């Protein structure tokens, strides 16, 4: 293509110029800028190619581990957990053990240990996991026990086999199960506000079911499985709309179990598509499908995922709500992209159709690649891994800042991709 440009340019110059001297001058005047332009074009293409080639989950994980390790040494108190970095700050603001986000930081540390094998990071993970034990043995005043305990003790048990961790997990599952209302068939969300809201079920709560499924397979009551399956079923039937977008909140009559209405709490409007809620659905229903082998849960994850992917903006990272009125100037939500990537990778491992399997893996890889770009990757800007997450826009809370759960799901997605790449490399070696 570059050669054709030169030939075309030279031919036109030869035709137009009568004077040989003037021709040479004119050629020089035109060729030099052209050569400069083409050179820049080559450099630009090479740079773009280099950026694509250089994205490696293993490389990014290595960089992230170094940053996480450095950050852990600055969080002095084991009962204070990073949550967000406000605008103008470079270090994490922390919350106590009872905040719903308390499990994400120890979860990040466990992922960093899994990626590196660094024993000093393991010690940090153990240190920040220990305080969450109290959640498992206290009355359930928070439905997010799965986020809090499974992401801390769950990873700890998976990576160490510590029997004490297992007992904490089993107790946490029993505690979460106390929020189940058999009249409705779902776990109560926001139990501390039950006088105001009666029985609500939010889409986020799908992510707490993994704790129940795990416990039922590891020495807990089979009732825990039944509760988790019922909750997923009620959520599927009532919170997933005909257009495949998801209500944030479903309100039910706590006595009759009747569905009253779907509404939002953190989205733009009741009928809008709140980005992170949609991704909780992708991932949550994929987990439910994996644990129950129910095709309707798998189909729900697929249609929710397809609706999400079909509505993504050009760079692939969703705005906080797909129907926010100020798009394209609305804040993005990198955390939703991270959750989506994990859900899509889970979904890719469940579908049998090879084309669909590749579609969801490619979509997840693209999301993580964009999150790893200079637009979203924090680098040296602050202690977080990712920029541009949005927590609760209607309350003007945590808007366009780093939030800890974005980093958690980013680390999970990177680890998943690394394992997929290693498996593919291993297969290629066998074939050769």
Per-region residue spans from a language model:
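Ala/Thr-enriched low-complexity intrinsically disordered regions
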Residues: 9-11, 15
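Glycan-recognition and catalytic cores of secretory/periplasmic carbohydrate-active enzymes
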Residues: 13, 49-432
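Bacterial N-terminal signal peptides that target proteins for export
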Residues: 20-34
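Membrane-interface junctions at the ends of membrane-embedded or membrane-associated helices
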Residues: 31-35, 350-353
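Short, linear, compositionally biased motifs with a strong N-terminal bias
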Residues: 39-40
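C-terminal motif of bacterial Sec signal peptides marking the signal peptidase cleavage site
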Residues: 43-44
């Amino acid at each position: 293509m570059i050669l054709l440009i030169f030939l075309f340019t030279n031919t036109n110059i030869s035709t137009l110029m009568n004077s040989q001297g003037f021709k040479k001058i004119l050629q020089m005047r035109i060729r030099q800028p052209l050569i400069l332009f083409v050179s820049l074009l080559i450099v630009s293409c090479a740079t773009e190619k280099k950026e694509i080639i250089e994205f490696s989950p293993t490389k990014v994980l290595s960089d992230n581990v170094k940053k996480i390790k450095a950050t852990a040494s600055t969080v002095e108190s084991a009962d204070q957990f990073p949550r967000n970095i406000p605008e103008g700050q470079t270090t994490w603001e922390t919350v106590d053990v009872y905040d719903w986000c308390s499990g994400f930081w120890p979860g990040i540390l466990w992922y960093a240990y899994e990626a590196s094998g660094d024993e000093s990071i393991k010690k940090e993970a153990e240190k920040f996991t220990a305080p969450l034990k109290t959640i498992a043995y206290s009355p359930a005043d928070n439905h997010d026990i799965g986020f809090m305990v499974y992401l801390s003790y769950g990873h700890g048990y998976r990576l160490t086999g510590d029997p004490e961790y297992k007992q904490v997990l089993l107790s946490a599952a029993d505690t979460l199960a106390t929020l189940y209302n058999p009249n409705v068939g779902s776990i109560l969300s926001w139990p501390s506000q039950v006088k105001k809201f009666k029985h609500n079920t939010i889409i986020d709560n799908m992510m707490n079911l993994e704790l129940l499924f795990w416990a039922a397979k590891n020495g807990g009551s089979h009732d825990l499985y039944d509760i988790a399956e019922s909750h997923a079923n009620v959520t599927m039937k009532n919170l997933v709309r005909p257009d495949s977008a998801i209500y944030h909140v479903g309100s039910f009559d706590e006595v009759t179990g009747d569905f009253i209405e779907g509404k939002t709490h953190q989205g733009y409007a009741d009928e809008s598509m709140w980005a992170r809620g949609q991704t909780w659905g992708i991932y949550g229903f994929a987990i439910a499908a994996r644990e129950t082998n129910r095709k309707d849960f798998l189909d729900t994850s697929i249609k929710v995922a397809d609706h999400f992917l079909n509505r993504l903006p050009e760079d692939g990272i969703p705005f906080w709500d797909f129907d926010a009125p100020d798009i394209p100037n609305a804040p993005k939500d990198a955390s939703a992209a991270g959750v989506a990537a994990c859900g899509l990778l889970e979904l890719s491992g469940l579908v049998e159709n090879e084309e669909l399997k590749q579609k969801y893996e490619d979509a997840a890889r693209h999301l993580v690649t964009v999150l790893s770009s200079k637009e979203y990757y924090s680098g040296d800007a602050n202690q977080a891994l990712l920029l541009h997450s949005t927590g609760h826009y209607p309350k003007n809370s945590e808007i366009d800042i780093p939030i800890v759960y974005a980093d958690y799901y980013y680390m999970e997605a990177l680890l998943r991709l690394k394992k997929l790449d290693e498996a593919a490399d291993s297969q290629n070696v066998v074939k050769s």
